[in-house]
Swiss-Prot record:
Lineage of the organism: Bacteria, Pseudomonadati, Pseudomonadota, Alphaproteobacteria, Rhodobacterales
Positions marked as site (Transition state stabilizer): 95
HAMAP family on file: Catal_peroxid
Name by which UniProt lists this protein: Catalase-peroxidase
Catalytic residues (UniProt): 99
Origin species: Paracoccus denitrificans (strain Pd 1222)
Gene name of the record: katG
Amino acid sequence: MDGNDIRSTGKCPVMHGGNTAMGSSVTAWWPNALNLDILHQHDSKTNPLGQDFNYSEELKKLDVEALKADLRALMTDSQDWWPADWGSYVGMFARTAWHMAGSYRTSDGRGGANTGNQRFAPLNSWPDNVNTDKGRRLLWPIKKKYGNKISWADLIVLAGTVAYEAAGLKTYGFAFGREDIWHPEKDTYWGEEKEWLAPSDSRYGDVTKAETLANPLAAVQMGLIYVNPEGVNGKSDPQATAYQMRETFARMGMNDEETVALTAGGHTVGKCHGNGNVTDLSPDPEAAGPEFQGLGWMNTKGRGIGRNTMVSGLEGAWTTHPTQWDNGFFEMLFKHEWTLTHSPAGASQWEPITIAEEDKPADVEDPSIRHMPMMTDADMALKVDPIYREISLRFMNDFEAFSDAFARAWFKLTHRDMGPKARYLGPDVPAEDLVWQDPIPAGRSDYDVAAVKARIAASGLSASDLVATAWDSARTYRGSDHRGGANGARIRLAPQKDWEGNEPQRLARVLSVLEPIAAETGASLADVIVLGGNLGVEQAAKAAGFDIEVPFAPGRGDSTAEQTDAASFDVLEPLADGFRNWQKQDYVVSPEEMLLDRAQLMGLTAPEMTTLIGGLRVIGTNHGGTKHGVFTQRKGALTNDFFVTLTDMANNWVPVGNNLYEIRDRKTGATRYTATRVDLVFGSNSILRAYAEVYAQDDNAGKFVRDFVAAWTKVMNADRFDLAA
């Protein structure tokens, strides 16, 4: 039975109504079916604000200083239902923001703070996110007051930033612009485990080798934000924990210095809570009964608040003054020798062997009582690991450097998934350009577009070359963290120019023709590449009998090598591109699943994905010039032949090798075409076949061209945030 099964004597055994639970869904019957739902998320049907809602316009109405004043007041406005430690919510709001932003991973750009996803499952119920629900509920009166002018995503991150300011930190800045989602994300893979905090072994090739952590994951266990605070698989070993920290934080986009700064700065304020018994807590928010109203982990047997709060199970503060921004963390760590012990809840943690009474942090409710401070295994890693130790000692001896490093790392942590500065809004955006923001110089729009287009048309480059190059330049865009895309023309720079998926020799040949055109006309190369692709599409449409102009908006810029962190772009390299019928090697994941993942990252719907596949095949853009899926005798013409052939029952589909099929005439057995799984899924999957049949219809050849142009333009402009503004 499904998770909504309710058994009670005297109740009618007949089910009424719709399929409201997960257990009896279509995918439960056919778990291996292609899940197109990831392409149909976050549409207007789930958004209560409506299609016309414009967050950037609402933000213009926000009184930012009044909002920050209200947040500062909240920091010390302790509520009886969830009292503040030491009368301050600084630690609470810093942790809530940290844990929302800290789920980001660079591998696919998913996770992070950009969508307010902590409000929904699974993140709202992760073991590592215990009591972040209380943080969000404490913010509700402010969200209620400012309404649509501030998103939950922006509010949570701003609250964390204001918390640090209230503690005394000079922060680096803040940008608004995060838009809320309205249901759980269906596309993010958090791991294969079926239980919270399952041992790390299933996600590592070798748990003793941190680099063997499975992609795209960054956290070491299901339900954790980063590493296990008690040690690898809960077994204390600070050096082993350091190895996992280094890999995990690197996958979050952080270097060693940023890792030390974030760990120490995160633990300069607040405390761990483990003065209780986990068995006394109610279920997590998703599993709790309706009487809990979306709150989880409530103590149903004891007091459960203040000094009796349960969160991680570890217990204690890291510093003498946990509501102040100071250098107390490093001083506490290096001033004392530490021994392994256990919290009242039984969690492994470290405490000083000896410590002066005045160095102990006060009780959260009674300042006359003092308690032992504590360190996690991750904290001890900063002392034990040679690289982390050197950085930590430098920070301990230079508080200003530590404060600046943390402020910058905090800004990076909370803004990493927002994309370039063009998406930043509000009065506190820092003026400095940072390389991790993938800066792009302003482009020109005052050149003669028609003249540039004429130069490209006379260049001798084929429509296939033009379309493939523009596609390769634009397809790197990821809607998850808004990185990549055609703007910046980074396809000409390392590492993109050497990616196998970009066909380096063909790319170099095409760029050698387009670069002089850009230089001589005043257009950016980024614009010329896209304009060339548009021209190729127009030529292909004309060859099919349709005159159509592909929309073009000039103004892209060309980034330099100095503005490009080459190593950070490695994660954008495509391992496969079903749109060009290519994959680098065989993978456990099927080719059609990899196509779906790329389409989702690019922000495409299933119909858009379908029309792009059909058009790119017949134009002839396959990687390496392969003929797989080119179901036409009019290659180079933007016809609907791909769909016509795919749905023609005169054909038979025969597997002839790994991911390879032949399309044979049913009567003669003659081979007409070859195909891959990516091609055939548009006839085998019932939903995709329904789309294919629409485009195969005799009366929809023109619709196909128009829809292809619309989807193409969407891809080319995906990173043009200046247009959206």
